Amino acid sequence: QVKKGISRINVKLRSLQVGENGEKTVSEESEINGMGPEISGEELEIFYQQLDALQKGDILVLAGSIPTVLPSTIYRDIMKRLQKREVMIVVDATKNLLVNVLEYHPFLIKPNNYELGEIFGVTLSTKEDVILYAKKLQEMGAANVLVSMAGDGAVLVAEDGSTYKSEAPEGKVKNSVGAGDSMAAGFLYGY
């Protein structure tokens, strides 16, 4: 429990367009994310002690941005600390936060196709392209790579070398917040 700044407020803004038939559709979605709590060295040490209780077969999910008061290597530091414990670690983060942990062989990483493309400096528009670059992340150390592609579905490149492609379900998106988090949770539940 942190003593100062215990809450973080994130605001999601959606721009609606009204079509000729009067139907409203989301044309753009923007995020304004708060900074999060202040974390002291003492509080960080307590957190590390809690991590030390993890054992073989436990699952740890490292997701999202990190507070600015923590080192930018915090995910990597956590994985290094736990590497001999055989904890199954999932990382859902962007560019450097994600790439920097690959040497510690995360069980699952979950970028979206835009984040995956950003890592390699390319635009990925087909599932075949996504599979190619997901395999590159495996070569860099990830065991399983699950890539969400919004309305175009998803791709999984599994640690046994199999690849799976899925279409997105039909429907009208009301809000995409948490979609990637729920995908990672669904994968873990089904695993």
Predicted regions mapped to residue ranges:
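Short hydrophobic/aromatic-enriched beta-strand-loop microsegments
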Residues: Q1, F107-L116, Y164-E170
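Conserved N-terminal subdomain of the carbohydrate kinase-like
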Residues: Q1-D58
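Short glycine-rich anion-binding loops that position phosphate/pyrophosphate groups of nucleotides
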Residues: G5-S7, M35-P37, S65-T68, E115, ...
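Short, charged, surface-exposed secondary-structure boundary motifs
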Residues: R8, G41-E42, E118-L124, V173-G178
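A polyampholytic, Gly/Pro-enriched intrinsically disordered region
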Residues: G19-G34, F107-E118, L132
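Conserved beta-alpha-beta core of the PfkB/ribokinase-like small-molecule kinase fold
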Residues: I46, I59-D129
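Conserved phosphate-binding/catalytic region of the ribokinase-like
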Residues: R81, V99, K127-Y191
